[in-house]
A protein has these predicted regions:
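Membrane-helix boundary/coupling elements in multi-pass transport proteins
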Residues: 1-10, 184-216
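Transmembrane alpha-helical segments of multi-pass small-molecule transport proteins
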Residues: 3-6, 12-42, 229-233
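Hydrophobic alpha-helical transmembrane segments
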Residues: 21-26, 52, 97-101, 183-187, ...
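Residue-level recognition of membrane-helix boundary sites in multi-pass small-molecule transporters
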Residues: 22, 41-42, 130-133, 185, ...
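Residue-level recognition of transmembrane alpha-helices
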Residues: 24-28, 47, 135, 190, ...
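Loop-to-transmembrane helix boundary motifs in multi-pass membrane proteins
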Residues: 211-233
Length: 233
């Protein structure tokens, strides 16, 4: 949750020109109200909406960025070879291959298989087969990470070398410099939907853990469904 708030604060703050603490506070308040009012069903619906928008916007950004950079061949030639190699030397200060090899599987299994905000999405499916299809579809979508979310950072470095000092702002820097005002507005909506959905999922999972593992188990085992929903909200 903290990492999501940090990333969201950077994105929204850079787009709207407001301090990070205001961005974070706004995201928490809006996400909390959204989770309270709609619950998991509303969060799932927002996930589908923001997924489609995010893929569309990112694909368009890659196409426009590659065109500005002179095509993929020109982009490849303009960047160091290490940018296209996932496994860096073990003495790399950023991503040594040993850390990737040992760390990513652990983090991946933790997030995708045990994190409550992810598990609740699968457990909320109407049946086992639907849950399995959703999990497999989510895995297929991860393949899009490389072309849609890594390439924009490399494109930004080629077009705007000064961004190397603040790499966290590369995506939004590319958006604000390549897209017209109307598309920037669409990106703002997409980012807000993605942040609210992610934060709402985390808040909903925290609410579930507190309600079921603390309130029901420790204080009121005989609580009716109405009480459980009220405490969760």
């Amino acid at each position: 949750l903290a990492l999501t708030l940090f990333a969201g604060g950077i994105l929204i703050g850079q787009l709207l020109g407001i301090p990070m603490w205001e961005s974070v506070l706004g995201l928490v308040v809006i996400s909390g109200l959204f989770a309270m009012a709609g619950g998991l069903k509303a969060i799932a619906s927002t996930n589908v909406f923001q997924m489609a928008l995010l893929i569309l916007v990112s694909a368009l950004l890659v196409v426009v960025g590659l065109h500005k950079a002179g095509g993929f061949s020109a982009l490849y030639e303009a960047t160091p070879g290490s940018f296209w190699n996932l496994f860096q030397p073990n003495d790399s200060p950023d991503y040594p291959w040993l850390a990737i090899l040992l760390g990513y599987p652990i983090m991946g299994v933790w997030f995708w298989c045990t994190d409550q905000s992810m598990v609740q999405s699968v457990l909320g499916a109407k049946d086992l087969k639907t849950g399995q299809r959703g999990a497999n579809f989510c895995g297929l979508l991860k393949i899009l990470d490389v072309p849609l979310f890594i390439l924009p950072g490399i494109i930004c470095l080629v077009l705007f070398p000064e961004i190397k000092a603040t790499p966290d702002k590369a995506y939004i820097h590319l958006v604000t410099n390549l897209f017209p005002s109307g598309l920037i507005g669409l990106v703002v909506v997409t980012m807000l939907a993605a942040m609210i959905s992610t934060i709402g999922s985390a808040l909903n999972s925290l609410s579930t853990v507190f309600t079921m593992d603390i309130y029901v188990r420790k204080y009121k085992p005989a609580a009716c469904n109405k009480d459980v929903v009220r405490i969760g909200r």
